[in-house]
């Protein structure tokens, strides 16, 4: 499985002909190295409807005939705009061609059309990826670790709108993933974080690896 960090909260997973993109905020993303026309996902997963996460999702979905997977409110809003969508909600699971999606809670807003914000645990060709979305720390992350053995947790660390790096270390302790990757930081001055210090803290305080990717970087997970 290839994991690519596009920037902010946007991450893409690829395996064979399957591509999943989370929160494709690309064209107006000041740290992204590509444009929305450079991605061609089969599936788009939206954690919430704020502009810095919804981003270019609707246009990408129309251009590529992608299936948008999100909460019922977001899926309904997308369908009204001509996008193919599958509605889910917190606590729900669903099998797809690539594997399984579980919708998890997130402590955040979503935008007027968005309902509740969420996260996802995606079993993508046998690798379990937890994208927390925008969220504060919450103790029920421990339940997520009881339900799923996570290979990599993608966690926000920028503070202000989400948990910061210190809380993300605690989240890692709750989730017990094999690896963790920080996102949603240093996009703007309002959400600063020291990713090298975060990596050091993860190494010292958890049993997880930490992968710090710059926007445009990718890695293989075997």
Swiss-Prot record:
GO MF terms, alphabetically ordered: hydrolase activity
HAMAP family linked: UPF0173
Keywords associated with the record: Hydrolase
Protein's name in the database: UPF0173 metal-dependent hydrolase Nther_2337
Pfam families: Lactamase_B_2
Native source species: Natranaerobius thermophilus (strain ATCC BAA-1301 / DSM 18059 / JW/NM-WN-LF)
Entries under PANTHER family matching the protein: UPF0173 METAL-DEPENDENT HYDROLASE MJ1163, UPF0173 METAL-DEPENDENT HYDROLASE MJ1163-RELATED
UniProt similarity note: Belongs to the UPF0173 family.
SMART domains: Lactamase_B (SM00849)
Superkingdom of origin: Bacteria
């Amino acid at each position: 499985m290839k994991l690519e960090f596009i920037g902010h909260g946007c991450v893409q997973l690829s395996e064979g002909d399957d591509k999943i993109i989370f929160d494709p905020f690309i064209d107006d993303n000041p740290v992204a190295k590509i444009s929305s026309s450079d991605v061609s996902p089969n599936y788009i997963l939206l954690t919430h409807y704020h502009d810095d996460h919804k981003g270019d999702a609707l246009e990408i979905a129309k251009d590529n005939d992608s299936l948008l997977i999100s909460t019922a409110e977001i899926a309904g809003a997308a369908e009204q705009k001509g996008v193919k969508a599958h509605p889910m909600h917190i606590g729900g699971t669903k099998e797809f061609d690539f594997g399984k999606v579980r919708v998890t809670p997130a402590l955040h807003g979503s935008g007027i059309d968005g309902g509740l914000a969420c996260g996802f645990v995606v079993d993508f060709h046998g690798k379990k990826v937890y994208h927390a979305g925008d969220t504060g720390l919450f103790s029920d992350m421990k339940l997520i670790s009881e339900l799923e053995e996570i290979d990599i947790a993608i966690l926000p660390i920028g503070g202000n709108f989400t948990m910061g790096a210190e809380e993300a270390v605690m989240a890692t302790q709750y989730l017990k993933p094999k690896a963790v990757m920080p996102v949603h930081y240093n996009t703007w001055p309002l959400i600063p974080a020291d990713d090298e210090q975060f990596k050091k803290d993860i190494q010292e305080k958890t049993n997880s690896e930490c992968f710090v990717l710059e926007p445009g970087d990718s890695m293989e997970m075997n």
